[in-house]
């Protein structure tokens, strides 16, 4: 007797809402960066080590940007944990391997804080890759 595959269960509504909020926040953050003169090189760059929300370039600078969306900007500021920072650094290294022509650029790890009805807040050099 052949097994029948049960239909996959849809994701929980709160997970769908969180995903949509994240996509919206990343779109707002990317638009804000472009208005500041950055060129978006990648969005949601996935690696086995982690994901980079936005990779942006301005002149000879590459910014790896983590976007944090919360109800309040203060809450967003505290949402970037040391473990996440390490995953972003590892993902940035993978991005540089895939994009070696940018290896000589200045590298920076930024954060973009996004809250409803507020302009995104860009935090250049929010953390560094030093051990």
UniProtKB/Swiss-Prot annotation:
Similarity-based family: Belongs to the UPF0102 family.
InterPro entries associated with the record: Restrct_endonuc-II-like, tRNA_endonuc-like_dom_sf, UPF0102_YraN-like
SUPFAM superfamilies: Restriction endonuclease-like (SSF52980)
Molecular-function GO term, any one: nucleic acid binding
Residue ranges that the Swiss-Prot or TrEMBL entry lists as coiled coil: none
Top-level taxonomic group: Bacteria
Signal peptide location: none
UniProt protein name: UPF0102 protein RPD_0400
Organism: Rhodopseudomonas palustris (strain BisB5)
Any matching Pfam family: UPF0102
């Amino acid at each position: 007797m052949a097994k029948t595959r049960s239909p996959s269960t849809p994701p929980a509504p709160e997970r769908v809402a969180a995903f949509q909020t994240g996509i919206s926040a990343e779109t707002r953050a990317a638009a804000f960066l472009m208005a500041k003169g950055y060129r978006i090189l990648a969005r949601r760059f996935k690696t086995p080590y982690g994901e980079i929300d936005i990779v942006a370039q301005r002149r000879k600078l590459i910014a790896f940007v983590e976007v944090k969306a919360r109800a309040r900007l203060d809450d967003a500021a505290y949402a970037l944990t040391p473990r996440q920072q390490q995953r972003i650094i590892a993902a940035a290294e993978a991005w540089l391997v895939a994009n070696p022509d940018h290896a000589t650029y200045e590298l920076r790890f930024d954060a973009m804080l996004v809250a409803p009805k507020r302009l995104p807040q860009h935090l250049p050099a929010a953390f560094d890759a030093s051990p």
